[in-house]
Amino acid sequence: MRKSLFLVIIALFLISNVAFAETSHEKVEKDSSAIMVRLGLLKGYQGGDLGLEKKITRAEFATIIIRMLGYQAKPFNPKPKISFKDLSKKHWAYMPVRMAASLGYIKGYSDKKFKPSNNITYSEAITIMVRILGYDDKLEGKWPDNYLNKAKEIGITKNLDVVSKKAMTRGDIAVLVVDSMGVEMK
């Protein structure tokens, strides 16, 4: 009987901690997304839903970082001209992707494609944020571990459960971007 009671108490303790952790992450996501909405970095879908649980594409993330950097309102004539085989001038995110690539924050794949409709992974998004913060491709180690380690070191992933090849959600991106805003640029 005592052993059963002890196991029940342990189980309740573990369940309450898991529930608290989920609630805590959801709060960080909501707070971060609210900041991004106020700054004009994150836009909702029709009806106002932010879709924080939805995966985010590479094109959507490029658009967010260009807004974050303030280039949306400035004239921009990137040199050298960067182009990707799968990104036409008619694509809705053509300019943000081109700007981010010209600035050196975004790189395409070895087949010279950008794959704008692919979901962005933790490794890809974190690499871009680390580059924006002033760290270049000369980080020690191999990609993506070198960027993931630098991100952890500078504190931009402290509120994320990073899974390298997993697609990020809009909520996760909000947390990453807001946590990056608190880091001094190199």
Per-range role (PLM):
Residues R2-S32, K43-A62, I66-Y94, L103-M168, ...:
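Feature responds to low-complexity, polar/acidic, surface-exposed segments characteristic
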Residues L176:
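Surface-exposed binding/hinge segments that line
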